[in-house]
Curated annotation (Swiss-Prot):
Gene: ALG3
Gene ablation phenotype (knockout): No obvious phenotype under normal and high temperature or salt/osmotic stress conditions.
Intracellular or extracellular location(s): Endoplasmic reticulum membrane
Name of protein: Dol-P-Man:Man(5)GlcNAc(2)-PP-Dol alpha-1,3-mannosyltransferase
Carbohydrate-modified residues: N23, N103
Domain of life: Eukaryota
Cellular component aspect of the GO annotation: endoplasmic reticulum; endoplasmic reticulum membrane
Annotated catalysed reactions: an alpha-D-Man-(1->2)-alpha-D-Man-(1->2)-alpha-D-Man-(1->3)-[alpha-D-Man-(1->6)]-beta-D-Man-(1->4)-beta-D-GlcNAc-(1->4)-alpha-D-GlcNAc-diphospho-di-trans,poly-cis-dolichol + a di-trans,poly-cis-dolichyl beta-D-mannosyl phosphate = an alpha-D-Man-(1->2)-alpha-D-Man-(1->2)-alpha-D-Man-(1->3)-[alpha-D-Man-(1->3)-alpha-D-Man-(1->6)]-beta-D-Man-(1->4)-beta-D-GlcNAc-(1->4)-alpha-D-GlcNAc-diphospho-di-trans,poly-cis-dolichol + a di-trans,poly-cis-dolichyl phosphate + H(+)
Membrane topology summary: Multi-pass membrane protein
4Fe-4S listed as a keyword: no
Main location: endoplasmic reticulum
């Protein structure tokens, strides 16, 4: 009869329903889940108090609004979009985001602070989902995610675009944990369009894509991400393409030595030199390759062994689907988060200059990274506190910068010494799941 369900479809539907119910039940059995909700509530109250009683710090808001006003006024030459801090140096996604902010707040600071307070809580919720799903950090240590004075300031007292970029980045990571690779790549590209620091995650993300999907899936995911960049920049690409690309994607900018939080101890003439930048880049790339070969691809026989095992450059999959390369195994959530957080952290350690708002680029990964090291808990907590203190020294000093670099390097050593676990888990057959539920 038309509309009648077959026994097989009924069994599959029952399996999916039971799986969802069990996942919800298991999730709420974890002490981390109610504790995470309590943290969100407590931090929401704290954010409200900060907005109400701590004076706003004027830094980039007026410049943002000036640049947005020029864009809304019809200016499409990126070289002419300027504020009191200089020309616009972010991709066009920044303009769309802050145009929406201006429309919602009228360009006023106080309602913008409320909006950023909501953004802070949304970002915290997404990060807590990542932590709960991976279950690497003990439940009580989730409180560390709410204890940064500098991060609260970046979100609700400074209103930096880093806040939107990192929220989108964390959202893309959450999607990757649910194996929504194509949708996650679209969100990731959206984050890049707000601020390019998100590209620090790109090398490890590419590796994960190669592990998670076949060649067709990888190419289509990358094409989707590229399409986002084209569509976002289209008004500028069809009018003043050279100006847009030169200003929005300038990778050669030299930051002011005075504001450097991480390399203040380096003499200014060395700090601004091309040789120093090249040395940092070489160290960055070397460590990325080393971690990829000996940590992230260890179980596949290193990078070369991994590429050979996939026949990536030699053959296309027999089925032009967007599914995983191997139907019997998937990447563990821990491997996804560890690779992305560590890859980004390597870039942070060897960034020539970290300004105060750049702390948001990796703060939310710190508890996770510390608990991936073999260090005792007391040392992890001391290092977390030490990094937070370094970021709250204003202005930074050679001593605070030197201490920050030392703490970063110790974490890197700990991550290198940590054992490499199998990045794959077996995917159970649906029938075996039905038998388990019965």
């Amino acid at each position: 009869m038309a509309g009648a369900s077959s026994p097989a479809s009924l069994r599959a539907s029952r399996s999916r329903r039971l799986g969802k119910e069990t996942n919800r039940s298991d999730l709420f059995k974890k002490p981390a889940v109610p504790f995470a909700f309590a943290l969100i509530l407590a931090d929401a109250i704290l954010v409200a108090l900060i907005i109400a009683y701590v004076p706003y710090t004027k830094i980039d808001w007026d410049a943002y609004m000036s640049q947005v006003s020029g864009f809304l006024g019809g200016e499409r030459d990126y070289g002419n979009l300027k504020g009191d801090t200089g020309p616009l140096v972010y991709p066009a996604g920044f303009l769309y985001v802050y145009s929406a902010v201006q429309n919602l707040t009228g360009g006023e600071v106080y309602p913008a602070q409320i909006l950023f307070g909501v953004l802070y809580i949304v970002n915290l919720g997404i990060v807590l989902i990542i932590y709960v799903k991976t279950d690497v950090v003990p439940w009580w240590a989730l409180s560390l995610l709410c204890l940064s004075k500098r991060i609260h300031s970046i979100f609700v007292l400074r209103l930096f675009n880093d806040c939107f970029a990192m929220t989108l980045l964390h959202a893309s990571m959450a999607l990757f944990l649910y194996r929504k690779w194509h949708l996650g790549m679209l969100v990731f590209s959206g984050a890049v369009s707000v601020k390019m620091n998100v590209l620090l995650y790109a090398p490890t993300l590419l590796l994960l894509l190669l592990k998670a999907m076949n060649i067709i899936g990888v190419v289509s995911a990358l094409a989707g991400a590229a399409l986002v960049q084209i569509l976002v920049g289209l008004p500028f690409l069809i009018t003043y393409p050279v100006s847009y690309i030169a200003n929005a994607f300038d990778l050669g900018r030299v930051f002011i030595h005075f504001w450097s939080v991480n390399f203040k101890f380096v003499p200014e003439r060395v700090f601004v030199s091309k040789e120093f930048a090249v040395c940092l880049l070489i160290a960055h790339l070397f460590l990325l390759v080393a971690f990829a070969n000996y940590k992230w691809c260890k179980h596949e026989g290193g990078i070369i062994g991994f590429m050979r095992s996939r026949h990536f450059f030699l053959t296309l999959p027999s089925s032009l689907s967007f599914s995983d390369v191997s139907a019997s195994r998937i990447i563990t959530k821990e491997h996804v988060v560890t690779a992305m957080f560590v890859g980004n952290f390597i870039g942070i350690v060897f960034a020539r200059s970290l300004h105060y708002q750049f702390y948001s680029w990796y703060f939310y990964s710190l508890p996770y990274l510390l608990w991936r090291t073999p260090f005792p808990t007391w040392l992890r907590l001391i290092m977390f506190l030490g990094i937070e203190l370094c970021w709250n020294v204003y202005p930074s000093t050679p001593s605070s910068s030197g201490l920050l670099l030392c703490l970063h390097l110790i974490i890197l050593v700990g991550l290198w010494l940590a054992p490499s676990v199998d990045p794959y888990q077996l995917k159970e057959h649906p029938k075996s799941q039905i038998h388990k539920k019965a």
